[in-house]
Amino acid sequence: WSQNTGPAVADYMLYKSLVFAAQNLDSETFKKYKASFLECVNKQKSPSILVFLTAEVPYLQNQIKKRGRSYEQNIEDAYLKKIEIGYKKILETELPFLVLKIDAATYDFKESEQGFQHLLRKIYSAKFL
């Protein structure tokens, strides 16, 4: 990654750590975490584009159940909604990369070749090159 000089596509956003930290840390600890996080993230190379999958809470709950991780089974809708709001706040800020939002419920990228091809077309047609 550090050697790459061309465009890079990411499906993971370091900033997501801030979203979860805001929900799980007390305000004083979060302030310290955020300051340290921003210092570190500013040293990282940014992707050219971030593929950000969006989904409504019922879809997320269904995916959580399908994944079957015992520690996730009791996640409440309200918590997922707070996480969604946190993501929206970050995505509304000026980020150093293009964000391509894709509704995860529209296409099955994992099981459907057609869905996967649709995702690839969206990425390649984005203006990030």
Provide a role label for each language-model segment:
Residues 17-86:
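A glycine- and Lys/Arg-enriched "phosphate-lid" helix/loop adjacent to the NTP-binding pocket
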Residues 1-7, 12-14, 20-28:
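Conserved nucleotide-sensing/catalytic segment adjacent to the nucleotide-binding pocket
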